[in-house]
Amino acid sequence: MRKRREGTANNSPTPEVTRVRTPRKENHEVLATVGSLLGSKRVNLQCMDGVVRMGRIPGSKNKKMWIREGDIVIATPWEIQDSKADVIWKYTRPQIEWLERKGYLK
């Protein structure tokens, strides 16, 4: 018979979020919601500044970030074309709750 580890129950509370990455204005970063997946590392983004952009997931983040519809991400709009952006960060559920409490998300 195996011993059961303490604290491994599924009903344990979610960890408290202490640090959350916020968009940096000096880098022109904006919060965005993933609208739809377009395929080929591309997504439709509804940005918080009111612009709908086509987002690109860079190759360095492709395998590390699994993005689904409805996820909250940080996007950096392109300097050349404002209708396109790079996805640079994806938030987890506790981080999204923190953003909502602090007023970053409407």
Curated annotation (Swiss-Prot):
Keywords: Initiation factor, Protein biosynthesis. InterPro entries: NA-bd_OB-fold (IPR012340), RNA-binding_domain_S1_IF1 (IPR006196), TIF_eIF-1A (IPR001253), TIF_eIF-1A_CS (IPR018104). Residues 18-92 form the S1-like domain. GO terms for molecular function: RNA binding; translation initiation factor activity. SUPFAM superfamilies: Nucleic acid-binding proteins. It holds the Pfam family eIF-1a. SMART domains: eIF1a. PROSITE patterns: IF1A, S1_IF1_TYPE. Residues 1-24 are annotated as: Disordered. Belongs to the eIF-1A family. Seems to be required for maximal rate of protein biosynthesis. Enhances ribosome dissociation into subunits and stabilizes the binding of the initiator Met-tRNA(I) to 40 S ribosomal subunits. PANTHER family: EIF-1A. HAMAP family: aIF_1A (MF_00216). This is Translation initiation factor 1A 2. The lineage of its organism: Archaea, Methanobacteriati, Methanobacteriota, Stenosarchaea group, Methanomicrobia.
